[in-house]
Amino acid sequence: MKRIQKGFTLIELMIVVAVIAILSAIAIAAYQQYLKEAQIAKIVSHYDDGIRAMRAELAKRAAQLSSGRKDLVVLNETFVIDEILNPEGRATAPLGGPAYLPGDADPEIGAIGIRITGGNRAGTEVVRIARPAFLEDVTAESVVIYANSAR
């Protein structure tokens, strides 16, 4: 009479564990690459959105000034970040913290820097938007937008 085997042998279990380990290693590597690409996309998106929003705001203000409006205030970094670029406060940098910072960009967390210089009256501001070097794939870049031309 032949004995009926119940369960799995040790070698079968070891093979299953080895296959799961190999699949896990591949999945983790792919997930890490996915996270890196998502962080890069986020920083590029914040930078491009900031440029578009500032150009639109400066063009709007230039039109208001040319139509005779005199009550516009001079822009500052805090106003630009809180009211124009991130009014709901939801935008975050890839590694946490705010997406936009007054002053210089922060390469540690991937935050975009906003610096406003220039005139002491509305319509003469110069806005510099800076993207930090982030990870090894994003190079530092900045754009300067002049309020009197919104270019």
Residue spans for each PLM region:
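A ubiquitous, low-specificity "background" feature that marks scattered single residues
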Residues: 18, 37, 52-55, 143
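Aliphatic-rich helix starts adjacent to a transmembrane/signal segment
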Residues: 31-49
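N-terminal single-pass transmembrane signal-anchor helix
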Residues: 2-35
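Periplasmic/extracellular, small/polar-rich flexible segments of pilin-like filament-forming proteins
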Residues: 59-151
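N-terminal alpha-helical signal peptides/signal-anchor transmembrane segments
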Residues: 44-65
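Amphipathic alpha-helical interaction segments
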Residues: 39-42, 55, 87
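A general marker of short, structured functional hotspots
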Residues: 4, 27-30, 43, 75, ...
